[in-house]
Amino acid sequence: MQRFFAPGRTELAGNHTDHQLGRVLAASVDVGIRARAARRRDRRVCIHSRGYRPFTVSLDDLSVDARAYGKPWALVRGVAASILEAGGQIGGFEAWASSALRTGGGLSSSAAFEILVGRIFNALYNGGAFTPEQLARFGQQAENRHFGKPSGLMDQMACARSGAVYLDLAAGEILPVAAPFAAMGLTLSLTDTGGSHAGLTAAYAAIPADMHSVARRFGAETLSQVDPADFFAHRQPGLADDRAAHFFAENARVPQMRDALARRDAGEYLRLMNASGRSSEQLLRNIQVRGGDDRLARGLACASALLDGVGAWRVHGGGFAGCVQALMPCTAFPAYRQAMEARFGPGSCRELRITGAE
């Protein structure tokens, strides 16, 4: 019996830039999914997860099944298929898992699960031959093809590596980054407003679809291939172009936030983080589905009232529901947490600790 762990992730900068092969700043955090696993003699994977019904999936047929979109066993089959395509080995295993990540709660439970499954296959059948970067790509492929969600690579890469990482996906650049918030006198927090990303795949998928449509106007497949000056010279009214404008501004902001961390410049980082949050709200518009759950919008409004002039706040991850990320002086966090939990319930607001941050 072997033990495994896959962390959740927090997106620090680069909101909806990864699916356009843009730039991202993300990090693994100190909560995730733990499991014990052992080989089986057959080609079945059986997973028992605390709080969920156990499931068994056969590895004999790894073709894409649209009926399994959104189901965890689809991710198992997808990761297994990618390992085989890469020349690896697969086989059955039994796993007992316990997750500290709420499904749809904003710390990328699906990516953590993909990385966990990849690590189990890697250890039990491949002697650890696959790198974290390869496992991240296997997870992304599983999510795109088998799970039916058009995610970029940010979630999986952050979950697969330890600590903070800067990604320039167009350039193929992956760099470790120090994110010493505590040493900068800051506390990073996440407030779960109670909404869930589950069931919001269509709203999420509309964002990359809009961005791809703008890119094609300029003869490109992704916005990272489009000259920002060319776009702004020919910008058209409408949501798709607003989302493209967000991409170009956010993509330029990511290395600036990386550099602010390197200098431990708290004031500049907070300024840029607030600019990221405003861009998501005003241009990307991934806060609320029309007529849908408004808890994320209310959470951002609360954070604004509490932290204006003191800290920074932004939508976390895919948006439309889920979590508010906030950064503030350490001395301000107790009062902030008390106020947010008064609105969203006990335990809804927690400090996020980045693994390997210092």
What are these regions (language model features)?
Residues 111-112, 323-328:
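FabD-like malonyl-/acyl-CoA
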